[in-house]
């Protein structure tokens, strides 16, 4: 963007300052802080689409996120769709990437993600469900202050409504409410 601004003769200092206010679209990396009883969490919404490369990039992003002393990195993952015969290997193969990125808890939705969930060490398994809608309650119950929660999956895996449920649940709670 800055290269295009420079080519158009725009002042780069002003252009870079303006870029600081651009927010990622919903489902494509939007970050927001939500209130929980113990403080706040950071929600990273990557719910619009997923393929092996974008899933690894999102896990790298989660792994690079700084968490507080009490916070955890939580990945809530839905199926990557339309992968054909390689689907099982591509889903279960994410386990190494998850461990390398110090993800503390993984929730998984969908029949393809079951292969990943089964490949994970027991200590980081949150819950698996056949549908994302069945993870709403377990994810909400697991979250506490300081956590960074990333939600990612193919659009067809319906992770967007889970993001909306998290937003609605935690925005509706006053910061001082009991947990």
Please give the residue ranges for each predicted region.
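ATP-dependent carboxylate-amine ligase
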Residues: 2-179
